[in-house]
Amino acid sequence: MPESDTRTIHHVDAHVGQRVRQRRTALILDQETLARRIGVSFQQIQKYERGRNRISASRLYDIAKALAVPIDYFFSDLERGDPRHDGLWPRTWGAWPKAGAPRPIRCA
């Protein structure tokens, strides 16, 4: 049995794929047209939209450009604080030091 048939589809992959499909259909584009714009087959677009294949960061960038949306469009409807999101919205961010902030020096 092929690996793609046995793996569980991650809910974030399914969500991103659904958002790709929503935007593509809102622009009245077929899968073949989007595929040509980003240099893949229409079958690959089908797999992305169904969440069967994960979309790499560079490919998601290409899709966002082709669909004229910012990258965060694909993640905008994920609920914050949902533990299934593997720490995408950690509650502890406020407790972390800001990048570049001076840290106290401890003397022994």
UniProtKB/Swiss-Prot annotation:
Q: Pfam families of this UniProt entry?
A: HTH_3 (PF01381)
Q: Which residues bind DNA?
A: 31-50
Q: Which UniProt keywords apply?
A: DNA-binding, Transcription, Transcription regulation
Q: Which InterPro entries does the entry mention? A: Cro/C1-type_HTH, Lambda_DNA-bd_dom_sf
One example GO MF annotation:
DNA binding
User: By its UniProt entry, which SMART domains does this protein fall under?
Assistant: HTH_XRE
> Which SUPFAM superfamilies does UniProt cross-reference here?
lambda repressor-like DNA-binding domains (SSF47413)
Q: Which residues form the HTH cro/C1-type domain?
A: 20-74
Q: Which domain of life is it from?
A: Bacteria
The protein's name in its UniProt record: Uncharacterized transcriptional regulator in ATPase CF(0) region
Q: Which organism is it from?
A: Rhodospirillum rubrum
